[in-house]
Amino acid sequence: MNPILKGVYSPARLGVVALTLFGILGVTGCSTAVDETQRAWMNKIFRPYVPDVVQGNFISSEQYAKLQLGMTREQVRQIMGTPLLASYFHANRWDYVFEFKRSGQTVGKERHVTVFFDGDKVVKFEGDALPTEVELVAEIDNYSKSKRSFWEVITDTNKLPVTPPLQQPEVLVTSKTDNLPAGAAVPAANTSGSFWDFFGSSKKDPDPQSPQLGPGTLNDVPKPADSK
């Protein structure tokens, strides 16, 4: 081998080069992990502005109550507006769909109202349970109160209360006397002492039994103890 190349490809130099490459790869991997963490944190805090979106026609219960059979299409349009869905293949049907979104999230639920015509006259109309204008404002307001501000997200405060899970009911242990037939003798209770009863600190003396009194014993006067 050429003496010059022999010095270049020496084991010591190759080891240094290998360690350098491994170090560069490790630093690159760590920086990538840090960048991903920072990006996730920034996306959580600094969210792009998303305007409120109202899709369709808001139909309140007050508007729905004004519909009557026999109305013309123009009268329906004046009350409820131009329908969101008016198919060319279903000219006798107008579909009103309403949905409200705030910050990309749906507030409330999607509601539908359908009006059927025969020519230019209303013959039928149906729809979901519709809120009043006051109820819709309250529904949107409750959603706004559930959202946290920028500072609350940073400080991790003002979280919504978490409902604790329901406690599981206790399992009842079946008694030994539940399945006994009528008139059967009840088994005696276990009166054996426990392990700690063998020690003097926990062993209790049995209660002194009262003397059994026979006939005439209540009239006997106890004798004084002999003095020594």
UniProtKB/Swiss-Prot annotation:
Cellular component aspect of the GO annotation: Bam protein complex
Domain of life: Bacteria
Signal peptide annotation: 1-29
Record localization: Cell outer membrane
Keyword vocabulary terms for this entry: Cell outer membrane, Lipoprotein, Membrane, Palmitate, Signal
Predominant cellular place of this UniProt entry's protein: membrane
InterPro entries: BamE (IPR026592), BamE-like (IPR037873), BamE_dom (IPR007450)
Membrane topology: Lipid-anchor
Residues with a covalently attached lipid (S-diacylglycerol cysteine): 30
Region of interest (Disordered), ranges: 197-228
Lipidated sites in chain (N-palmitoyl cysteine): 30
Disulfide bonds: none
Purpose of the protein: Part of the outer membrane protein assembly complex, which is involved in assembly and insertion of beta-barrel proteins into the outer membrane.
Subunit composition and interactions: Part of the Bam complex.
Family that this chain belongs to: Belongs to the BamE family.
Protein name per Swiss-Prot or TrEMBL: Outer membrane protein assembly factor BamE
Provenance organism: Polynucleobacter necessarius subsp. necessarius (strain STIR1)
Lineage: Bacteria, Pseudomonadati, Pseudomonadota, Betaproteobacteria, Burkholderiales
